[in-house]
Curated annotation (Swiss-Prot):
<feature type="active site" description="Proton acceptor">
    <location>
        <position position="94"/>
    </location>
</feature>
<dbReference type="GO" id="GO:0030488">
    <property type="term" value="P:tRNA methylation"/>
</dbReference>
<comment type="similarity">
    <text>Belongs to the radical SAM superfamily. RlmN family.</text>
</comment>
<dbReference type="GO" id="GO:0019843">
    <property type="term" value="F:rRNA binding"/>
</dbReference>
<feature type="binding site">
    <location>
        <begin position="168"/>
        <end position="169"/>
    </location>
    <ligand>
        <name>S-adenosyl-L-methionine</name>
    </ligand>
</feature>
<feature type="binding site">
    <location>
        <position position="200"/>
    </location>
    <ligand>
        <name>S-adenosyl-L-methionine</name>
    </ligand>
</feature>
<keyword id="KW-0698">rRNA processing</keyword>
<comment type="function">
    <text>Specifically methylates position 2 of adenine 2503 in 23S rRNA and position 2 of adenine 37 in tRNAs. m2A2503 modification seems to play a crucial role in the proofreading step occurring at the peptidyl transferase center and thus would serve to optimize ribosomal fidelity.</text>
</comment>
<dbReference type="InterPro" id="IPR004383">
    <property type="entry name" value="rRNA_lsu_MTrfase_RlmN/Cfr"/>
</dbReference>
<feature type="active site" description="S-methylcysteine intermediate">
    <location>
        <position position="344"/>
    </location>
</feature>
<dbReference type="GO" id="GO:0046872">
    <property type="term" value="F:metal ion binding"/>
</dbReference>
<keyword id="KW-0963">Cytoplasm</keyword>
<dbReference type="InterPro" id="IPR013785">
    <property type="entry name" value="Aldolase_TIM"/>
</dbReference>
<dbReference type="GO" id="GO:0051539">
    <property type="term" value="F:4 iron, 4 sulfur cluster binding"/>
</dbReference>
<feature type="binding site">
    <location>
        <begin position="222"/>
        <end position="224"/>
    </location>
    <ligand>
        <name>S-adenosyl-L-methionine</name>
    </ligand>
</feature>
<dbReference type="GO" id="GO:0070475">
    <property type="term" value="P:rRNA base methylation"/>
</dbReference>
<keyword id="KW-0408">Iron</keyword>
Length: 373
């Protein structure tokens, strides 16, 4: 049985240098190899013309460059593109490309499904299967860059920003997310600045503390409620790490970080008559008084079977005005890609749920139906 080849997309620069040293090659070759992979989009060692033939043969014998394949894509009327990415065993994750006048953002997934159970999120309703590997995370960027055209082909960087806001909770896959973000930041990798790579979390406090010790990227936090009572329902991990504990961890991260320019991005999905009253806006403003932040108000994007509705524009406007009375920076996020179910909270993919969450939900619904009949 032949030895499984090492996928170079799984290795950040230190990892690739260590591999080359173990192979008896000079570590500086790692920079050259990474440039071929991430700047030129090369997956064939024979195309790496500044590496000698013997080394190319040695690499081909032990290594490979394999990214997950795009199985399908949909393009929205606003230019947003949602990609279905095959990660094996009949499973898919979703990745979303969002073009704007001054940037091109890719929303990247970190897990097959999600281990958290946020009640307003379509991904959460699908259950959870596993963490994505480093190559499956950076492979989303690599594959979409191929689709759009690499910088060396087009003269322009196809993706200027990456947000870890796709399927999954990134901090529950820290071992793979950190090396993947290292590749995003590395000048020999995708070469993005630390302010252009954003990790979004629902509040895994111990992992957030670890994150601040190993990497500096922009941080976004999913709050969605102004108090623990409501957040326990909307974001159940709050029962383990309540708001004050989460906010303290955010402040600790900000003390270590330069990428955030001293403030965190707070995400707050607007659910009609659930978390969008003016009283709740006052409560949220007071909650955040000691945590420097920019607040993104996100109109809820309904999905089939969702128990919530989207707040009206007038309720969102009133909520925003209250927050601004406290001198808070508030942005009402423009919904992108909702006509192809690519908007915030709508990503679902194709998941073999190991938690049996979806099956349990369907059984409960059928039992309710039988009782009512």
């Amino acid at each position: 049985m032949s030895e499984k080849k090492i996928n170079l997309l799984d290795l950040d620069l230190p990892g690739l240098k260590a591999l080359l040293t173990e192979m008896g090659e000079k570590p500086f070759r790692a920079q050259q190899i990474m440039q071929w992979i991430y700047h030129f989009g090369v997956s064939d060692f024979e195309q790496m013309t500044n590496i000698n033939k013997a080394m190319r043969a040695k690499l081909a014998a032990r290594c490979e460059i394999v990214a997950p394949e795009i199985t399908s894509y949909q393009k929205s009327s606003d230019g947003t593109i949602k990609f279905a990415i095959n990660v094996g065993q009949g499973q898919e994750v979703e990745t979303v490309y969002i073009p704007e006048d001054d940037r091109a953002t890719l929303c990247v997934s970190s897990q097959v499904g999600c281990a958290l159970e946020c009640t307003f999120c379509s991904t959460a309703q699908q259950g959870f299967n596993r963490n994505l590997t480093v190559s499956e995370i950076v492979g989303q960027i690599w594959r979409v860059s191929h689709f759009l055209g690499f910088q060396k082909e087009t003269g322009e960087r196809p993706i200027s920003n990456v947000v870890m806001m796709g399927m999954g909770e990134p901090l529950l896959n820290l071992a793979n997310v950190v090396p993947a973000m290292n590749i995003m930041l590395d000048d020999y990798g995708f070469g993005l600045s630390k302010r252009r790579v954003t990790l979004s979390t629902s509040g895994v406090v111990p992992a957030l503390d670890k994150l601040g010790d190993v990497i500096d990227v922009a941080l976004a936090v999913s709050i969605h409620a102004p108090n623990d009572e409501l957040r326990d329902v909307l974001v159940p991990i709050n029962k383990k790490y309540p708001l004050q504990e989460f906010l303290a961890a955010i402040r600790r991260y900000l003390e270590k970080s330069n990428a955030n320019r001293g403030r965190v991005t707070l995400e707050y999905v607007m659910l009609d008559h659930i978390n969008d009253s003016t009283d709740q806006a006052h409560e949220l403003a007071k909650l955040m008084k000691d945590t420097p932040c920019k607040i993104n108000l996100i109109p809820f994007n309904p999905y089939p079977g969702s128990p919530y509705g989207r707040s009206s524009n007038s309720r969102i406007d009133r909520f925003a005005k209250v927050l601004m009375e406290y001198d808070l920076t508030v942005i009402v996020r423009k919904t992108r890609g909702d006509d192809i179910d690519a908007a915030c909270g709508q990503l679902a993919g194709d998941i073999r749920d190991r938690t049996k969450r979806l099956a349990k939900k369907r059984m409960q619904e059928s039992q309710i139906s039988v009782t009512m009949n």
